[in-house]
Amino acid sequence: MDSVRIVAEGYNCFETDHAPVGTVRYLPDPKAVIALIQSGQLKQHILLAEGGTTTFLAPALSLGAIGVITLSGAPESHLGILSREFQIPCIMTAYLGDSATRYVTGSDNREHFAAVTAALSGKRVRLNCRDSDTGRIELVE
């Protein structure tokens, strides 16, 4: 049996018992999204993107992405709305439980983005979206 620990939390876009497990893949731009789709490995990855206005993830959502994590944004953002429409678990404005860095609107958030990306990229995680407000990112070891 896998051991699980909560590594990060954020805003939950919608409540669901569906808890996808996959390897986190940071997608900084449309080229990275296209490359992942063309690799045939889309359904093995939880997608990590910078913001809730990241519309270039739309092709991945329509082709069967299993889960999304963002570093900023809110459930009311474009990506939050799309995740609900496609019923793809999505946790937004993720922050690490063991770090003081947080996203702050209007601030330079590069340190926060780098910390979360470094901690999650390449890790096998489960998205727990059972709570209506808070989504939990669980490290699966």
Residue spans of the language-model regions?
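Non-catalytic, soluble scaffold/interaction modules
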Residues: M1-S72, E76-E141
